[in-house]
Amino acid sequence: MDLTKLTAHELKDILSNKEVKAEEITRAFLDRINLVDNKLGAYLYVSEEEAIKKAKEIDGKIEKNEELKALSGIPVGIKDNINVKGMQNTCASKILQGYTSPYDAHVTEKIKKEEGIILGKLNMDEFAMGSSTENSAFKLAKNPWDLERVPGGSSGGSAVAVSGCEATLSLGTDTGGSVRQPASFCGIVGLKPTYGRISRSGVVAFGSTLDQVGPMGKDVEDCALLTSAIAGLDKKDFTTADKEVPDYKKSLTKDIKGKKIGIPKEFFGEGLDEKVRKSVEEAIKVLEENGAEVKPCSLPLMDYALSAYYIISSAEASSNLARFDGIRYGYRSKNFKDAKDIYLKSRSEGFGDEVKRRIMLGTYVLSAGYYDAYYKKALKVRKLIKDDFQRVFKDFDAIVSPTSPTTAFKVGEKKDDVMSMYLSDIYTVPISVAGVPAISLPCGMIDGLPVGLQIISDYFKEDVLFNLAYSYEQSVDFYKMRADF
């Protein structure tokens, strides 16, 4: 039995039945990382000793017949912008190279409380800015389905770790599609929860009104398991909602008969690969066969979402990243004459090109004379986009679309074409701007590469997403796919 290919719920079953020890599971994953990660590039840091120590503790509890917790013995990888006490937290940036976190993020605390085994920190686009993980300052992450292709981004390492069987579960962050798009490219399941469903405390900020921590897993049940474990109110993050967290597993098997699904024409227009369109349309038919009522709908302001997103997120990034100045921690240039020179050279040398591009754009739209023309207008557009979604959700339980207009593209193909790279998130960005939840799951294969189906629902309706996603998933075999790597 290859333990690395099993889902979290399968591992839980064999652990509780004492068919395997937590230490065996952990060592199997550490061996897998040592074997393949030099080619896949998922990890920036591996916590081998700590993981084995934690696994032995769990085995001791099992020996005493103590009740297992939600994540007991399950190997988890954490994106390298989420704090784990005692581990590096670099955001895949030279400017934070060598920085070790002195505390746990709220989501990390919850994983530890539920006895998940944290294997290490995962590769990403620098400061979560990118759609291919080519913007990492340290190494490339590659798609397990085809090493010449990108895994998506910015949570590329998180997707690769699960798809490449280097972790059972992982955490990413999603600002404009950074969990869903790599999940689509790598053939796994990824959730962007409602803004405020999961705490951002201890997560390095990119766009504070957009960022959300998102769980990733091999199937829908795994994703639901991790979401239930980490969601909920956090007094250290005032944007979290004081709403009860349901046991999402209970929503999986409910009948979807009578669920109303909208198909927005704006998500099926120009730029969508025809083979991707066909895969998504076939998935919609499966949902219809399972009892859902499918009708067309319209979200007319979606054409403005990408522009609004890049103005708002870049403005927030320019403010959030001002703290990285080479003074208190992180990279400091050695070639400086005075204090001003430290700031200038440390940031110029420490940040990568994409981060600098967004800082400059954000600073520009917040500057006197341009604030009203760009930033203020973008906020107005955002409000209208939210209203658009609210109007549609009065008539529909969910909306279905492609996750990305294409399958995974080749490494280097879009690196120098900024607009083409940004357009790879055209179907995920509107959801982030509105703050509603969405899930991506595999719905087909094109030339050996996975295709992602995106299901979107109203605020705090993650249970609806899991219900519809599970109904589709169990009707097809795509969730059983594993990259032959």
UniProtKB/Swiss-Prot annotation:
It is an enzyme of class 6 (ligase). One of its GO terms (biological process) is translation. Its EC number is 6.3.5.7. GO terms for molecular function: ATP binding; glutaminyl-tRNA synthase (glutamine-hydrolyzing) activity. InterPro entries: Amidase, Amidase_CS, Amidase_dom, AS_sf, GatA. Keywords: ATP-binding, Ligase, Nucleotide-binding, Protein biosynthesis. SUPFAM superfamilies: Amidase signature (AS) enzymes. The keyword Ligase applies. Signal peptide: none annotated. The active site is at residues 79, 154, 178. GO terms for cellular component: glutamyl-tRNA(Gln) amidotransferase complex. It catalyses: L-glutamyl-tRNA(Gln) + L-glutamine + ATP + H2O = L-glutaminyl-tRNA(Gln) + L-glutamate + ADP + phosphate + H(+). Disulfide bonds: none annotated. Pfam families: Amidase. NCBIfam families: gatA. Allows the formation of correctly charged Gln-tRNA(Gln) through the transamidation of misacylated Glu-tRNA(Gln) in organisms which lack glutaminyl-tRNA synthetase. The reaction takes place in the presence of glutamine and ATP through an activated gamma-phospho-Glu-tRNA(Gln). PANTHER family: GLUTAMYL-TRNA(GLN) AMIDOTRANSFERASE SUBUNIT A, TRANSAMIDASE. Heterotrimer of A, B and C subunits. Belongs to the amidase family. GatA subfamily. HAMAP family: GatA (MF_00120). This is Glutamyl-tRNA(Gln) amidotransferase subunit A.
